[in-house]
């Protein structure tokens, strides 16, 4: 695999690795490419029902929702709510090597 530009993000509300996901969608894997509200909300709902959701974000700033209404500690309540139970990775999908991932 050639060198793809990617970076993992720490997601607030993510379950520990060894915690089994329970729910009717357990075993379903979802790739989320949405930003802001609608797509992430739908994916969050799937994750809440047990699906494994992997959010793909552009390198750099990531989803613009990360910066909406920042609190004093630098986090966004919107981001905390919409990203729960998901894993995130930043990939430059214009790069063929990143597309292979």
Regions found by a protein language model. Give the residues of each.
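N-terminal helix-loop segment corresponding to the beta1-alpha1 unit
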Residues: 5-101
């Amino acid at each position: 695999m050639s060198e793809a530009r990617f970076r993992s993000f720490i997601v607030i509300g993510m379950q520990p690795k060894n915690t089994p996901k329970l729910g009717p969608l357990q075993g379903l894997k979802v790739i989320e490419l949405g930003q802001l509200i609608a797509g992430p909300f739908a994916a969050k709902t799937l994750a809440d029902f047990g699906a494994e959701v992997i959010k793909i974000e552009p390198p750099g700033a990531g989803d613009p929702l990360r910066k909406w209404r920042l609190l004093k500690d630098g986090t966004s309540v919107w981001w905390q709510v919409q990203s729960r139970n998901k894993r995130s990775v930043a990939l430059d999908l214009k790069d063929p090597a990143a597309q292979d991932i």
